[in-house]
Amino acid sequence: MDSSSPQSLVDLAPALRLLVLALALAALPLSWWWLRQRGADTRTRLLALTALTLFLTFDLIVFGAFTRLSDSGLGCPDWPGCYGEVSPLGARDEIHAAQTAAPGGPVSWSKAWIEMIHRYLAMTVGVLTLVMTGAAWLARKSVQSSLPLPLSPWWPTLTMLWVGVQGAFGKYTVTLKLYPAVVTLHLLGGLVLLVLLAVQWAALRQQPLSLPQGVRRLAWAAAGLLALQVALGGWVSSNYAVLACAGFPQCNGEWWPAMDFGTGFTLLRGLGEVGELAGAGARTVASQVAVHMAHRLTAVALVLVMGMLAWRLWRAGAASKGFAQVLAALLLAQVVSGLSNVVLGWPLIAALGHSAGAAGLVLLMALLLARSRPAAAAVASPPLQWSAS
């Protein structure tokens, strides 16, 4: 591509080559899965494939956080390739020209590779969900149909379609130049994908967890509050409001600083600059403080609710003590990494750990809720069927 020509934000020229690359990349984990599961029954094979996809999806979410935190989201300013190429190797001249024109800008050799590796991993997950879907539908028609799978094939089908939605969010994250609402939706969409896979893995594993009704209600309440907190965390990150409050427990030396919630939570606006006062959608210091404080205050409520949940799970019986221990450990890690972001000035390792911990909490809560059954009904685990099937 001529580096002097205008750069199209959407360049589908490398799409076919990227598809071939995605198939090649996915062939590596799929080959490993197939070799290990050759003699297994249908349910065990699908369980292993779901676990593999779940593992890579968690990695994708963490690497996506690294892409965002390292300011690499526009390392390749077009989509789906990099300056119309499959990899930064073919776009050396364009990357060099962009970096020379703006040395402190969003494009550099390392950022281009970070962004493209994120896309490669996303494509690999997409192929795996496609294979999951095909395997689930084939299993439904196999000779083992007399022993039906504890999972409707519509679940992996929905998962595959959701990967397509995530791809669209990824595209608009780039083409709309890190539009905060799109960046936040992309982050939340990745976590929805994680939840979908976790629910399917739990259904295939068939290990129901008996819990008192009160504990289950508390778990659902904690999950709802966690969803709100994750959304607020995504909004803090996409608006670069992490450092809006210096110090803890006070914010900039005040218990209740000046805050502009109206501007801070104006969703339909582009990415502004700190201190820009013109226009209702611009991010002012007060609006960033409002975003930060909303996340901080919700964190206090979440720690209390999840701390109570961990205690109730510990007392509910031996089967749920493992969940209680992991929940308490993740909660403590989130508090430490969150405080480190503020006190230490947002170091990359703390910010990345905080994002990974949030994904870990979402995964844990999804598994807990997917496995939990009322105490009197947890003897058997009924198949997880699609409501419309």
For every predicted segment, state its role:
Residues 2-4, 69-116, 242-288:
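Extracytosolic (periplasmic/ER-lumenal) interhelical loops and adjacent juxtamembrane/interface segments
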Residues 42-59, 152-159, 209-232, 320-329:
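Interfacial segments of alpha-helical transmembrane regions
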